Amino acid sequence: DNKKQGLPVIIFTGAGCSKSAGMPLANELVAEINKKFKSNLRALTDTQKKDYGSCMGKLTPHEQKTLIEKHISKAKINWAHIALASLLKEGYIGKVLTFNFDNILNRACSLDSFYPPTYDLKVLSEEYFSAIPNQSIVHLHGQWSGFQLANSDIDTEQQAEKLKNFIKNTINNSPKLFIGYSGGADAFFELVKEN
C-alpha cells in the first residue's frame, strides 16, 4: 500500500544486518582493537576500552580503514541483503539508510543487474541531501571506500548534528523500519528519539 501511495518504506540498517555476512558487531571490533592496538589505548580507562567510539577515536584514520577493510574483503552476500536489494529494486523501499561502511547491499543489488545510486553523507554537503532520490543506498557514517568514516564519539556526534534535519524529514515523512541497529554505538539514536 505504501508503494501505491508514493510512500515507500525507509530502511535503516546497522551492523546486525551484516553480521551473518561475516561483518563483526561493534563489540567484536572493540575486542579486536584491544588486542591489536593496545598501545593506542593506554590513555583510556577500562570502561572506555569497552566503548566503540572511544577505541576507534584512538586509531588513525588509516588504522580504522585497514581494520574495517579487512572484514569487508572477506564478507559474503547474505539473505538479508538479497531481500533488501529485491525490495529496493521493485520500489517497495524508498531508501536504505545504513550505518554500515560495507558494500554488501550494493553487491546484492548487482546480482539482479540493479545498480542503485549510492551516497556517502559523511562527505556530501548538506545542501544536496534533499536531492537524494528513492531507490538509493545512503551511507550515514561514510563508506569503506570513501575518504572519511564517522567512527569516534566526536565524529558520530558531529555527523548526527549534520544529519539532524535530513533524519527529521525522513523519519516524519515516510514509514520506517530498523534492521540490525542497536543504537548503542553512536550519537544517532538521540535523533531518532527526538523525532
Please place each PLM-identified region on the residue numbering.
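Conserved catalytic-core helix/loop/strand module for nucleotide-ribose chemistry
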Residues: 1-175, 181-195
